[in-house]
Amino acid sequence: MLPKFDPTNQKACLSLLEDLTTNVKQIQDSVLEAILSRNAQTEYLRGFLNGQVDKQNFKKNVPVVTYEDIRSYIDRIANGEPSDLICDRPISVLLTSSGTSGGVPKLIPLTTEDLEQRISFSSLYAPLLYKHIDGLSEGKSLIFYFVTRESKTANGLMVRTMVTSFLKSIKQTNSFLWDSLQVSPHAITTCADTTQSMYCQLLCGLLERDNVARLGAPFASSFLKVIKFLEDHWPELCSNIRTGRLSDWITDATCTSGIGKFLTAPNPELASLIEQECSKTSWEAILKRLWPKAKCIESIITGTMAQYIPLLEFYSGGLPLTSSFYGSSECFMGVNFNPLCKPSDVSYTIIPCMGYFEFLEVEKDHQEAGHDPTEKPVVVDLVDVKIGHDYEPVVTTFSGLYRYRVGDVLRATGFYNNAPHFCFVGRQKVVLSIDMDKTYEDDLLKAVTNAKLLLEPHDLMLMDFTSRVDSSSFPGHYVIYWELGSKVKDAKFEPNRDVMEECCFTVEESLDAVYRKGRKNDKNIGPLEIKVVKPGAFDELMNFFLSRGSSVSQYKTPRSVTNEEALKILEANVISEFLSRKIPSWELHELHSGR
């Protein structure tokens, strides 16, 4: 586990990172020994190790697992059985993962001790930024955080996201460190009404514009959501600043009290300045114009977030985009030691004390090939990865996960001291993703199968399909390309708009709870679009891939297309376009139910 350190002492933090990345093997062996010694008598480990706690028996007898393999244990804990099924410490919260199991968000166990470790881990990044960016420590951060709605299991165990757990763990008595580093008071970020919270965080940021040194949000998609909100609400924000009065619709007590020390008097000069910038024809470089002393944008821009880099670059006006760390609900793992690198070059150095890390070797073309990475998986230790090879992380944690496959694909790009660093390649078998949603090929196929039933009464058939994410506007949305055929030979057909719009809705309604929550509740996913292409378009697509070396006998239409030339072929053949006109259903209980 992380040694105790002073997060305000930059020199001490950097020294700690040097030590951790130098003594990797020793730390990893110690971490595994500590985890096994603590948890050897749990029901889960007892079944494999029979009380033994050595590394050799662990690797030989404890299987590499997916969520489905351990779901029964987590369900039992959620239903009231003791935590010692999997962990010797009490499970304090079940984190809702962005990944799903059967369309339901995975529930990941977390102890209070592990949560505190993750908070400490998060504070390691600021010293790296200060080291690389001159003057950054002279101002504060305007990083937008939001809590999400929580729920409880049948026995009262909290179910919430990692960010919500982080924000709720900071009490009023120890929020002084937060308030010394962040522009927005901690209290405002804990407001359950995201709209009020976002408005007040923006208002704080505008009032303190000359004190903002960095901007951002945990993920690129959420930061763009803030920018879109600013586009819609800047006149009202300017009015509040001009009059010195907060809008009447802001009623949450945490917001009104938090904004009180900022909005103290009318400031017509500042209001006019903001109004002048926001009313210009183009919003290019708006972030740099509104916050002239900002040095960087801090947000995760790797993986599915990479699609938002062009939009962030447009709004930022040349400010560096920094991607801080790599982690998941299951485990926090890596830090970006080179924050000023190009977004396409971001790699994360694994911090060896956060868990025990193994890596499952993966074929580089596994996502395109559509088959399992290897028939006999090869699992290697952290120190034994090879540069240029692709791996799936396998984590063993202090909170009760043992040899758990995270589902990401990482590529080893080098070493910092003795700790390997990785770039993010993608998710195993994910074909579409915009924000926290992750739609797998099977999920998409089932959704399209449900929708195409609506074509049958009209003598139409779905001949083939593929998909992509359109992130040219915000929020992004799914696009599905359909090639239709008629059951009546030589018949000319014009797809009925009502039918096709219902097909769009049926696909959305058939997707998992995380997607539907993003559409209905979070509003960070736009309406799904179906584009009908000319007959023969998919033959052109096949010929394109065959020309690049694919085998005609093994060719399968890719269910998601990212290749620019392939997309040009599809777009050139589009004859009609349809958008979903209804919002799919979603209810809070779906976070931990079977729907």
Curated annotation (Swiss-Prot):
Q: What is the effect of changing residue 162 to V?
A: Increased affinity and enhanced catalytic activity leading to improved efficiency toward indole-3-butyric acid. Slightly increased affinity but normal catalytic activity leading to slightly improved efficiency toward indole-3-acetic acid
Q: What class of enzyme is it?
A: ligase
Does the keyword Oxidoreductase feature in the UniProt annotation? no
For this UniProt record, give its keywords in alphabetical order, as a comma-separated list: ATP-binding, Ligase, Nucleotide-binding
Effect of gene knockout: No visible phenotype in normal conditions. Slight reduction in root length when grown on media containing indole-3-butyric acid (IBA). Hypersensitivity to the auxinic phenoxyalkanoic acid herbicide 4-(2,4-dichlorophenoxy)butyric acid (2,4-DB).
Give the EC number: 6.3.2.-
- What happens after mutating residue 122 to F/I/L? Increased affinity and enhanced catalytic activity leading to improved efficiency toward indole-3-butyric acid. Reduced affinity but increased catalytic activity leading to almost unaffected efficiency toward indole-3-acetic acid
Q: Which residues bind ATP?
A: 97-98, 302, 325-330, 348, 408
Write out the GO biological process terms.
auxin conjugate metabolic process
Query: Catalyzes what?
Result: (indol-3-yl)butanoate + L-cysteine + ATP = (indol-3-yl)butanoyl-L-cysteine + AMP + diphosphate + H(+); (indol-3-yl)butanoate + L-glutamine + ATP = (indol-3-yl)butanoyl-L-glutamine + AMP + diphosphate + H(+); 4-(2,4-dichlorophenoxy)butanoate + L-glutamine + ATP = 4-(2,4-dichlorophenoxy)butanoyl-L-glutamine + AMP + diphosphate + H(+)
Write out the tissue specificity statement of the associated record.
Expressed in seedlings, roots, and parts of the siliques.
- Known Pfam families for this protein? GH3 (PF03321), GH3_C (PF23572), GH3_M (PF23571)
Task: Give the binding site residues for substrate.
Answer: 325, 332
Name any GO cellular component annotation.
cytosol
GO MF entry, a single one: ligase activity
Record bears the keyword ATP-binding:
yes
Family membership: Belongs to the IAA-amido conjugating enzyme family.
Q: What does this protein do?
A: Indole-3-acetic acid-amido (IAA) synthetase that catalyzes the conjugation of amino acids to auxin specifically using the auxin precursor indole-3-butyric acid (IBA) and glutamine and, possibly, cysteine as substrates. Displays high catalytic activity with the auxinic phenoxyalkanoic acid herbicides 4-(2,4-dichlorophenoxy)butyric acid (2,4-DB) and to some extent 2,4-dichlorophenoxylacetic acid (2,4-D) as substrates, thus conferring resistance to herbicides.
Full protein name: Indole-3-acetic acid-amido synthetase GH3.15
Originating species:
Arabidopsis thaliana
The gene is: GH3.15
